Amino acid sequence: KAAIKIQIRDVDNFIHKDFHNSKDIRYIKKTMDTKLSKESYAKLVETIKENSCITMATPFDEKSVHDCVDLGIELIKIASSDINDWVLIEEIAKTKKPVIVSTGGSSLKDIDDLVKFFQNRSIPLAINHCVSIYPSQKHELDLNQIDFLKQRYPDHVIGYSTHEYDEGVELPIMMAYAKGARTFERHVDIDYDKDSGKCVSPYCSNPENLDKWVKAYKKAVEICGSVGEQRRIIPKKETKYLDALVRGVYAKKNLKKGDKITEEDVYLAVPLQKGQISCRELMAGEVLLKEIKKDKQINIDDIDSPYAKNKELQEIIYKRGI
């Protein structure tokens, strides 16, 4: 199921008052330019719910954590930059809401400490592999870290939060899923500058490319198939194909009723025919119940064998082959 995540800041206090009008610090300028009222956040949250998505938010300060509670946010995200902001983390933990954390630029100790903190409080925690380079090049994605996180934190869901260039994002999400990531996060933007035809930020996807990204995820799920903890269910067409390659048992010479079959009496060859025993069922000492001419097939009904008494196996042998 999809979650739509918003970012919440108490902007007037999050940014020092002396820098409110700063134009040369991009992060501050962007934050000031995109400031929203609590009413606007409430409208966003309501729209998310109306579209049957999970409500999720990244609070960047303590007041914003309280806003998450007031807005009925279901899932809280801790940004990579805040993985050791313990004032904020303590406030988030008080909500008892499930948490996802991104690990971009974090030390192993930072991650271990955070995992232990939430484990000790029995608060569900998912851990995202993340590279905090905006935007990231393909060679910077380090998807093998998904393997590392899965091995180190086996009791937690591992995900993938990406900031790569918008073009060609399909392959990395497919690889991430194949490696075991099970939550996926990407920034979304809209082309409000119609003349440029580009997203505001190169690490964001516009709705059209996000659609490709989600479809790539679904294709990865289809390609990877069933869960990896148990043997897959073999489709009938695969079994039928392999049965056509299995060698059947044929008489090497004329054989009499009552003969005990030895390897000198038979040979193996394709095709395997319906009702015929194959190399899989051939056992030395099986007794013939009827005469078999040279080069003729030996069927399951022609021998006294444990296989002949297994009704389920009999049915398989009757139906397989040409």
Locate the predicted segments by residue.
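Catalytic cores and adjacent flexible loops of soluble metabolic enzymes
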Residues: 1-322
